[in-house]
Amino acid sequence: MAEELKIVDNRSREDANLSPVNKIEIYSFFDPFNTDCFKLSAIISKLRIEYNQYIRIRHILNPSLKVLTKCQAQSTSDFDNIALAYKAAELQGRLRAERFIHLMQNEIIPKKDIITEEMICDCIINAGLDYNEFKEDLQKSKLTESLKIDLHIAREMEIEQAPSLVFFSEDVHEEGLKVEGLYPYHIYTYIINELMGTPIEKNLPPKIEHYIQKKQLVTTEELLTIYEWPEKLMTKELKKLALQQKVEKLQYPEGDFWQSKMPRI
């Protein structure tokens, strides 16, 4: 564990203007174009399912020069710049903004699609955001200031790569633990249990069809992470859902994906 964890000064969290809560705070720094960040989203989903009452997660688009340069290179204007789009989406709620970025990653990771204004529009609407309000917020200069705040947080926590997770206990005097890169699920649960210091009762995941219906597009690897089933059993269940016309199998260079054919929830 010593090689996987780094200590983070808790002053970083104080600078983030977040009041302490009776939960473990997790800062998730991500790069929307990074495959490992896309894979980590499955682990974060599982953490939310099992430990929802014990954790609070804040997603921060890693505002490094490298990431922001990629965002700028993929855009022709502010309307198709994913970094600014994410900050504008956050103004309508962080959970909806996370939903938006997940839908965007569904487009740009497996399909290798170029970001367009139309793609962003579709993902904004499908994430349950008000598109007209989103367009108005995109034109506000405070989005750039918001990115600068994120950059300050990242520098204070010495974030050097994405994905990176930083864990803080409810004790503001305790230092945080930083995990850089992608690791097996048990590494993250070990940290949560250590920080809680008391026995934790985990929640069970929803029915697999309900999970796919909510996420809309998932990988086989993600489902194996969430449910921890033998691969043969997972394949059998997915084939059954496909026969029931509830899901459709899609094949991309990044692997097999399963797309929901059920109404969005």
UniProtKB/Swiss-Prot annotation:
UniProt keyword Cytoplasm present: yes
GO annotation, cellular component aspect: cytoplasm
Annotated InterPro entries: Adapter_SpxH, Thioredoxin-like_sf
Keywords: Cytoplasm
Pfam families per record: Thioredoxin_5
Subcellular location: Cytoplasm
Domain of life: Bacteria
Ribosomal protein keyword on record: no
Signal peptide: none
Gene3D superfamilies the UniProt entry points to: Glutaredoxin
Family: Belongs to the SpxH family.
Record text on subunit structure and interactions: Interacts with Spx.
Function comment: Adapter protein required for efficient degradation of Spx by ClpXP under non-stress conditions. Interaction with Spx stabilizes Spx and exposes the C-terminus of Spx for recognition and proteolysis by ClpXP.
Protein name: ClpXP adapter protein SpxH
Organism encoding this protein: Staphylococcus haemolyticus (strain JCSC1435)
